Amino acid sequence: VDAPADMVIKAPAGAKVTKAPVAFSHKGHASMDCKTCHHKWDGAGAIQPCQASGCHANTESKKGDDSFYMAFHERKSEKSCVGCHKSMKKGPTKCTECHPKN
C-alpha cells in the first residue's frame, strides 16, 4: 500500500475545531495492518478518509460509531488512536501529546 510517510490529520471542513491538528506518521505504524484503522477498506481499492460518508462523517457529536471525534478518541476501541495506544501501553494518550498547544 502506498501511504504518505507523514501527514497531518485535520478536522473536516465545517467541524467545530477546538484543538490543533495532529501530526501522524504512517511510517511509524507500518508494522500494523492497515485495516486496523481503515476498518472499512476492502484491501484493494482506494482508502477513504475517516470522515467519508458511511464511516465517521458525523462532526456534530462526540458520541456514536459515526462520530469523527470517536474515530480517534474512543478509549474502549482498539480501532481508535487513544484506545489502541492504551491497549498497547505505548504511544500518546493525553490531549497535548497529540494536539500541541498553539
Swiss-Prot record:
Heme c 2 binds at residues 39, 50, 55-56. GO terms for molecular function: electron transfer activity; heme binding; metal ion binding. Heme c 3 binds at residues 29, 81, 84-85. It is found in: Periplasm. Keywords: Electron transport, Heme, Iron, Metal-binding, Periplasm, Sulfate respiration, Transport. The second heme binding site has an unusual CXXXXCH motif. This is Cytochrome c3. It comes from Desulfovibrio desulfuricans.
